[in-house]
């Protein structure tokens, strides 16, 4: 999924060779800069992996919570009906059930 969007990998950056001209860039400066870019790529890749794992975990938790919610609602309705029945018995006494 990530490989489709990213054009360069850390390995490709590391192995990239630049031709030198008469008055080209200092190779040492280019190498230092590319090393920083590689470290950033690796850090971003690691962060993306961790976030994708967390995202999957949260989706599973949400799915489980949604599955449990209707069961809790039925239990709550049962409790309300039971309390209502007890209140009716208390208010109207046994006349209601005779």
From Swiss-Prot:
Where in the cell is the protein located? Answer: Cytoplasm
Q: Name one GO biological process term.
A: regulation of cell shape
What broad class describes the main subcellular location of this protein? cytoplasm
Q: Which InterPro entries match?
A: Cell_cycle_GpsB, DivIVA_domain, DivIVA_fam
* Pfam families noted in UniProt: DivIVA (PF05103)
This protein's GO cellular component annotations are: cytoplasm
**Any coiled-coil ranges, and where?**
34-72
Its biological purpose: Divisome component that associates with the complex late in its assembly, after the Z-ring is formed, and is dependent on DivIC and PBP2B for its recruitment to the divisome. Together with EzrA, is a key component of the system that regulates PBP1 localization during cell cycle progression. Its main role could be the removal of PBP1 from the cell pole after pole maturation is completed. Also contributes to the recruitment of PBP1 to the division complex. Not essential for septum formation.
- Descriptive protein name: Cell cycle protein GpsB
Instruction: Look up and give the organism this protein is from.
Output: Bacillus licheniformis (strain ATCC 14580 / DSM 13 / JCM 2505 / CCUG 7422 / NBRC 12200 / NCIMB 9375 / NCTC 10341 / NRRL NRS-1264 / Gibson 46)
Q: Which gene encodes it?
A: gpsB
